[in-house]
Design a protein with these regions (language model features):
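Helix-terminus/linker motif at the lipid-water interface of multi-pass membrane proteins
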Residues: 26-44, 113-115, 177, 237, ...
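N-terminal membrane topogenesis motif
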Residues: 1-27, 85, 219-239, 495-509
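Transmembrane alpha-helical segments of multi-pass transport proteins
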Residues: 235-241, 439-496, 505-509
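Signature of the first transmembrane helix
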Residues: 9-67, 102, 106, 132-133, ...
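Helix-loop junctions and terminal segments of transmembrane helices
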Residues: 63-78, 279-313, 317
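Alpha-helical transmembrane segments of multi-pass membrane transport and lipid-handling proteins
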Residues: 91-115, 310-361, 393-394
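Short runs within selected transmembrane alpha-helices of multi-pass transporters and secretion channels
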Residues: 24, 32, 51, 62-70, ...
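Hydrophobic transmembrane helix module of multi-pass membrane transport proteins
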Residues: 95-241
Length: 509
């Protein structure tokens, strides 16, 4: 009964938070399209590249606060300790590190301007970006604390406020200040960062958390906390370094293919600002679920409740695979039209259709990383990410000078297929889960075939009625999606309970 209530609670929170995320992701995609039309794809590529370096600086200077607070405070709550003391450890460490990093970067802010000779990247802009690093670290800690106490709607509200302020600041500068030369693109980006992060800190700092555990004995000493935090921080830092290295290499390899610097930045901006967000846009439910299962699994691990670990992992994997297969079908069917709507040309649609097969692996990665973080397996994540990015960067260096833009897509396909196959094997072995592949793959495939026929039928009907392309995509997605979900529900009903009872007897014994 308790497990059923937990499952329903997790599903309810996932649906509600996904609705927040869908809105934010959609608005973010619209913002990228707006910036591309107003400033040009090259400027968006420049913003994306500098944003990648900013993300690296934020993570290296204390950006691991979210996962640290979410996981370690949940473990402390699970064992009846003092989570408030753990939070003080996390906040003190992250704030000290971020303030030192911001001060150091401010001192040497003249160096990038001198080396790169970019008119938009001056010392003033770099110092503005550095000023937001402590705010970024504190907001990450505050969000992680909310997740640990299961007050998951508060970070969602704060993210809405943050996005509105960031997008509003950037849009205002784009319309009124940048065209007149009163402000550079990157200075506008820096101001939007400060406005957004500041709003999150202000909002979440006003929220009071339970203090009934403050008198309990903390199971963590500061030394033990640091020993457990270092793998978490190392994993986040490694991913950020590899991701930024990959982003920096993309324009360089496009130059080797024969593109001009402006064309290289424009193609990079189109890939990162339109194509990748379009692929990730449907994954908002997986992103929310991944954040929710980290504290759930951490509490189950602290209580040595292997039954709950298996239940949560199995349910998350099943839902993710079934959902991802439907998205693959939709991208294959309507990728060209989506590309025309988002990018204004058929080339974007061709790349979306080309990359559709990698969608299940992308969405599984989101969920599996949540499982690994919840169970404290950060060392494996670090090693796997290292191998994954070695594959990605190797393919990038080989294929982009030969094939241009298609080489970027090929590198993304190669690293996701290899890295997530290994990640899935490790998660199954770690949890002792014995998935029934008939339910995970065969039944969704049967339902998918039926949904595909419905989608083709509805598409022909809508075209006959001469409906706009956008309306055709929405109607087909809604009707075929409901049919797919209904068929899956009907064919998965028999024997579900008996399988789960059987599947959850291994580790307990």
């Amino acid at each position: 009964m308790v497990h059923a209530q937990n499952s329903r609670k997790l599903l309810t929170e996932t649906v509600i938070l996904s609705s927040f995320s869908v809105g934010l992701q959609g608005l973010g995609l619209l913002l990228n399209i707006f910036l591309t039309h107003q400033l040009g794809a090259a400027s968006v590529g420049e913003i994306t590249l500098i944003g990648s370096f900013y993300s690296l600086a934020a993570i290296l200077s204390g950006g691991c606060g979210f996962i640290a607070a979410s996981r370690f405070m949940s473990e402390e709550l699970g064992c009846g300790g003092n989570p408030h003391r753990v939070y003080q450890y996390i906040k003190s460490f992250c704030m000290t590190l971020s303030i030192l990093a911001a001060a150091l970067l401010c001192i040497f802010a003249w160096l990038p301007e001198k080396l790169l000779h970019q008119p938009n990247l001056n010392a003033q802009t770099i110092r503005l970006l550095c000023a937001s690093l402590p705010l970024s670290a504190l907001s990450a800690c505050l969000k992680g604390r909310c997740y640990a106490y299961n007050r998951v709607y508060l970070p969602a509200v704060s993210e809405c406020i943050e996005f509105l302020l960031r997008a509003g600041t950037l849009a205002f500068c784009t319309l009124f200040l940048i065209p007149r030369g009163s402000m550079s693109v990157l200075t506008a980006l820096a101001l939007s960062m400060i406005a957004g992060q500041g709003s999150t800190v202000l909002f979440l700092s006003c929220i009071r958390m339970p203090h009934r555990e403050n008198c309990n004995i903390c199971s963590f000493s500061f030394g033990r906390f640091l020993r457990q935090l270092l793998p978490v921080m190392g994993n986040a830092s490694l991913v950020a370094i590899l991701s930024t290295t990959n982003d920096a290499l993309v324009p360089l390899t496009l130059l080797q293919f024969g593109s001009s610097p402006t064309e290289a930045l424009a193609q990079f901006g189109e890939f990162e600002a339109i194509i990748i967000p379009a692929l990730f846009f449907p994954s908002v439910m997986q992103c929310v679920m991944s954040g929710l299962i980290v504290p759930e699994l951490s509490r189950a691990k602290a209580a040595e409740d292997h039954h709950t670990i298996r239940l949560i992992t199995e349910r998350a994997l099943e839902q993710t695979i079934a959902y991802a297969l439907f998205i693959v079908m939709y991208l294959v069917q309507f990728g060209r039209q989506i590309g025309e709507v988002l990018g204004g040309d058929t080339f974007t649609g061709q790349i979306l259709r080309f990359m559709a097969p990698v969608v299940p692996f992308i969405y599984l990665e989101i969920i599996m990383e949540g499982v690994l973080r919840g169970l404290g397996k950060h060392n494996f994540s670090s090693v796997n990410y290292l191998a994954e990015y070695i594959v990605r960067i190797s393919v990038l260096l080989i294929c982009v000078p030969m094939f241009g833009f298609y080489g970027i897509a090929a590198s993304y396909l190669a690293c996701n297929l290899s890295g997530n196959t290994v990640r899935l094997y490790f998660v199954l072995r770690l949890t002792g889960l014995k998935p029934v592949w008939k339910r995970i793959l065969l039944r969704p495939a049967i339902a998918l075939f039926g949904a595909w026929q419905i989608m083709l039928l509805m598409s022909k009907l809508c075209i006959t009625l001469r409906l706009p392309a956008f309306a055709v995509m929405i109607i087909c997605a809604a009707v075929s999606g409901l049919f797919y979900a209904g068929i899956l529900y009907l064919i998965n009903q028999p024997n579900i309970q008996s399988h789960r009872t059987k599947n959850c007897t291994g580790l307990s014994a």
